[in-house]
């Protein structure tokens, strides 16, 4: 069985960073995205090396992806309303499909993920049973406790209730999970079943 781990680092220009926390940050605080950009640059090599070493320790291929130029151009032309941050997030799902053409099982790790185990992910998690992701449901607050000052558009609360509203609009059950896609383990079979990009334009 062919397996691969990959990660993604796109150094989004500062001018294109969306300041999603502008309404909640203190006047003298640094925007989260500015701080993240700076920390990634400082810790770049360490964050790459830890993933390379982990992949080597469990005997699977590793790929570090750092160029999304063509994908970025495609989105800017066809979906100009989408932020660079969100283009990157769609790009990582696109890459799951690209690697799925060659590999039976794929593990994606966000750039800030640091493997701290010697266990083989692919042996611990049986990807024949489904997609391996973490849900953040425990971080969703009751709607009556949510105010504009307690969340951002990236918070689990926003993701949960926005998804709920869209499900209700389509006449579906509002029950949903808040999925953290910082770590995604998936098989080629389930990528095909997911059909993520099949109705992409309508879903947007």
What are these regions (language model features)?
Residues 1-91, 98-102, 188-189:
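N-terminal anchoring/stem segment of glycosyltransferases
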Residues 5-7, 61-66, 106-110, 115, ...:
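A structural signal for short, well-ordered beta-strand segments and their strand-loop junctions
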Residues 12, 115, 192:
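Glycine-rich nucleotide phosphate-binding loop and flanking beta-alpha elements
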Residues 16-39, 141-170:
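Charged, glycine/proline-rich intrinsically disordered loops and linkers
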Residues 79, 85-154:
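GT-A fold catalytic core of metal-dependent nucleotide-sugar glycosyltransferases
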Residues 165-204:
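Catalytic core and acceptor-binding pocket of nucleotide-sugar-dependent glycosyltransferases
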